[in-house]
Amino acid sequence: MNNVINKEQINSFLNSWAEGVLAIGKCYLENENYTQRALIFIEKHYAFDHGSVMFKPTFTQEKIFRNDKESALSYFAGGEVPEDSGFAIKPWESINLSEVNYLIENNFSAVMGTLHLKPFDNEKISVIAFTFVLEKYNDSIKIKIHHSSEIK
């Protein structure tokens, strides 16, 4: 089985991740079940169902790490953790990637770059640096390690 993840697959995954975050926000704006959409997003993009995941989201202060599916869901859609207002239900109008760097060696794949997030309600762009360590399960790419922080 070939577990190598190439740049094209990583770029496709990054686009899917960004589109997934935007889709959660769209569900929120349209009064649809955004929590269910967030759960589907997490199951598609994160490896929680395959073992341990290390997740340090961008906007956390009290509970820094979200290393289980429930607290990741809280981060994206609000809920379990009191500080969470829901990263994906801000909501964002656009998410653009730049400065993407790849590390692909044998069966190890990592990507880092910047995300430029524009909210619907104002023009202030949030710039976030991110690092994802990726792993392939069958034909699905999932995040094993996610670290992100805001650039001010």
Name what the model sees in each region.
Residues V21, L115-L117, H147:
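Short beta-strand segments enriched in hydrophobic/aromatic residues
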Residues Y28-V100:
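A solvent-exposed, acidic/Ser-Thr-rich amphipathic alpha-helical stretch
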Residues N2, D84-N122:
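Functional cores of ribonucleases/endoribonucleases
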Residues L14, A72-A77, P119, F130:
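Aromatic-residue detector
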Residues M1-F48:
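Short, low-complexity N-terminal intrinsically disordered segments enriched in polar/charged residues
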Residues K26-C27, Y34, F59, P119-D121, ...:
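General N-terminal targeting signals
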Residues I5, Q9, W92-S94, K142-K144:
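A broad structural signal for short, well-ordered beta-strand segments within beta-sheet-rich domains
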